[in-house]
Amino acid sequence: MVIANSIKTSIPNYVIKDISLSDFGRKEIKIAETEMPGLMALRDKHHSDKPLNGAKIAGSLHMTIQTAVLIETLVDLGAQVKWASCNIFSTQDHAAAAIAEQGISVYAKKGESLDEYWQYTHYILDWGTDSPNMILDDGGDATGLLILGSKAEKDLSVLKNPSNEEEIALFNSIRSKLQEDSSFYSRIKGNIIGVTEETTTGVARLYQLQKQNALPFPAINVNDSVTKSKFDNLYGCRESLVDSIKRATDVMIAGKVALVMGFGDVGKGSAQSLRGLGAIVKVAEVDPICALQAAMEGFSVVTLNDVVEDIDIFVTATGNYQVITNDNLIKMKDEAIVCNIGHFDNEIDVASLKDYPWENIKPQVDHITLPSGNKIILLAEGRLVNLGCATGHPSFVMSNSFTNQVLAQIELFNKSDEYSKEVYVLPKHLDEMVARLHLDKIGAKLTKLTKDQADYINVSVEGPYKPEQYRY
């Protein structure tokens, strides 16, 4: 591990695994840039006018090669940035090293502890005598930390009863920070112009805060941009899920019986991913519409309890809690593979497995012996499998998501007076612009409406082409 601190402050400039990996990281970043036309187009368009000049962004998002391209785009557009990963296993250490080498503050190591995770999240919010004024979040941890910390300033009892290991680490980190600075969280929170949120789970948190009239600043829901949710969540998972399972286990997918729990965009991509390599795929759902979609796609729609003893590969993709419980886990067949591709690690009751013998096979791959004598293979300790056991989504699809992130940061930072403390979605014309920026790369050519055709369907020749409520 490398900790660098060249200025007089308690916060190091960066904390990474190994700075000598920076050359390797830079080579991969250069390749990724060729696959991320949206971000590169924004660099070209805004290199001179610097629309993020003055923005001080606290970023909490997986520290991957693709994220490195995002970070350097934000910096190229004028922003100052501090970055941490939003998952303890998702960092690519060579990507973090390449960013640190450029003098950008990054705090991320693959396999960091929970205590380190929350320390690093504090680091991106602590700018000494200065303060961040924007948050770029993935899962809502940076935003949630400010909110919970502000509550703890007034009432420490909110930290009284942690329910799991993560909350123990989180609560301890807040207590420690309050001993240093009793008004840290409210001070930083008061300086935040807004947050842009990347993923489904984080967006759900924001809408819950809005419903409670507790959202402390405006938020843009990047996840529900069509060019994010219908591309990153669907097509990204379609490629990265089986990549991670095969890297972790070397198992043959063909002929295996797989259960995908959840058939939203992530579940749809996951089911396609497994079926594409020859798995017999079943789906579990609570939503009748999604269940019907799964059935119409040819998947058997089942309940976990009915099939748990017959499944070879379990994949959770719900964004919910305790989807696979201990009662389910102990019934699994020998060598069943269990993994999660939802954002948080509580979809699978991993805590209950701590009572059984564990054998680590390699990083993020564990053999766990059940009371029955059967062994299951748990991937990434129930955290995001595609980032814990592989490198996440391909660069091209992440260019869609991250182009939306940059546009959202520009929008909130420059038009803050137009936004109240609510959750917003980017307008349709920006969604279409993101898609348009990616067509040339894959050789796609758009047909253009004539004026008469546009008038006939009551749209502009240049778009937007669909109403806001249109479901793609």
UniProtKB/Swiss-Prot annotation:
What is written in the cofactor note of this entry?
Answer: Binds 1 NAD(+) per subunit.
Chief location category: cytoplasm
Catalytic activity annotation = S-adenosyl-L-homocysteine + H2O = L-homocysteine + adenosine
GO molecular function terms here?
adenosylhomocysteinase activity
Q: Which SUPFAM superfamilies match?
A: Formate/glycerate dehydrogenase catalytic domain-like, NAD(P)-binding Rossmann-fold domains
- For this UniProt entry, what's an example GO CC term? cytosol
Q: Which domain of life is it from?
A: Bacteria
Localization per record: Cytoplasm
Q: What class of enzyme is it?
A: hydrolase
**Pathway the protein contributes to:** Amino-acid biosynthesis; L-homocysteine biosynthesis; L-homocysteine from S-adenosyl-L-homocysteine: step 1/1
Q: Which UniProt keywords apply?
A: Cytoplasm, Hydrolase, NAD, One-carbon metabolism
Query: What is its cofactor?
Result: NAD(+)
Positions with a binding annotation for NAD(+): 199-201, 233, 262-267, 285, 320, 341-343, 386
Report the coiled-coil segments.
none
For this protein, the Enzyme Commission number is: 3.13.2.1
Q: Which GO terms describe its biological process?
A: L-homocysteine biosynthetic process; one-carbon metabolic process; S-adenosylmethionine cycle
Record-given protein name: Adenosylhomocysteinase
User: Which organism's genome codes for this protein?
Assistant: Prochlorococcus marinus subsp. pastoris (strain CCMP1986 / NIES-2087 / MED4)
What is the name of the gene encoding this protein?
ahcY
